[in-house]
């Protein structure tokens, strides 16, 4: 009996150690802070972390401090300059996704959304093709993808633009198109 008790304590300790290895950083902020935090002139933390899927499934989509800082950089280097240039609101379809949310929406395991480095965006009344071309020609970025736009030059309501930003020394300036036919380089 003593041997069994010792074995149980050892097993419990091993489980605690394993759990600590996979433990995510603690969220940086209280939920109230998310609702009020203005990351840049026109973007809030609430809109960058909001997800209908997270809400309906009861998933916590609170970023860590590191993820928050990367979203702040994305706003400073890409989203806010776009908003300032076009003078129109930018619709954020998806920005930050915690691991559980990313799995729930079928996102890539290496998705930059999980790091706070990417956003799927649109500007109402503007074709996503034109938006992507402007970013490609005028901004620093890591990855730029025209997603699910079958007739990209003519249908302003089709798909969205995925844009990510890491840092000037790491950004790849990779341009892709993804649609029903597959993935190709460029637009």
Regions flagged by a language model, labelled:
Residues 74-78, 88, 101, 117, ...:
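Amphipathic alpha-helical interface surfaces
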Residues 108-121:
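Active-site microenvironments of hydrolase-like enzyme catalytic domains
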Residues 11-85, 167, 178-187:
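Extracytoplasmic cell-surface/polysaccharide-interacting catalytic and binding patches
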Residues 42, 89, 118, 160:
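A residue-level signal for beta-strand positions that form part of recognition/binding surfaces
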Residues 77-106:
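Extended, low-complexity, intrinsically disordered C-terminal regulatory tails
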Residues 2-4:
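Extreme N-terminal basic, low-complexity initiation segments
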Residues 115, 123-187:
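Catalytic cores and adjacent binding grooves of peptidoglycan-active enzymes
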């Amino acid at each position: 009996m003593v041997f069994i008790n010792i074995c149980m304590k050892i097993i419990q300790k091993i489980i605690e150690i394993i759990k600590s290895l996979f433990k995510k950083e603690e969220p940086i902020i209280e939920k109230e802070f998310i609702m009020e935090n203005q990351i840049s002139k026109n973007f809030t933390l609430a809109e960058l972390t909001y997800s209908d899927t997270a809400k309906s499934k009861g998933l916590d989509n609170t970023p860590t401090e590191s993820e928050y800082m990367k979203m702040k950089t994305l706003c400073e280097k890409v989203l806010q300059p776009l908003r300032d240039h076009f003078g129109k609101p930018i619709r954020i379809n998806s920005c930050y996704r915690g691991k559980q949310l990313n799995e729930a929406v079928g996102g890539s395991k290496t998705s930059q959304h999980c790091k706070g480095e990417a956003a799927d965006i649109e500007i109402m009344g503007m074709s996503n093709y034109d938006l992507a071309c402007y970013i490609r020609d005028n901004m620093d970025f890591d990855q730029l993808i025209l997603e699910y736009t079958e007739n990209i030059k003519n249908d302003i309501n089709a798909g969205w633009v995925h844009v990510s930003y890491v840092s000037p020394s790491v950004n790849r300036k990779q341009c892709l198109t993804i649609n029903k036919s597959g993935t190709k380089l460029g637009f």
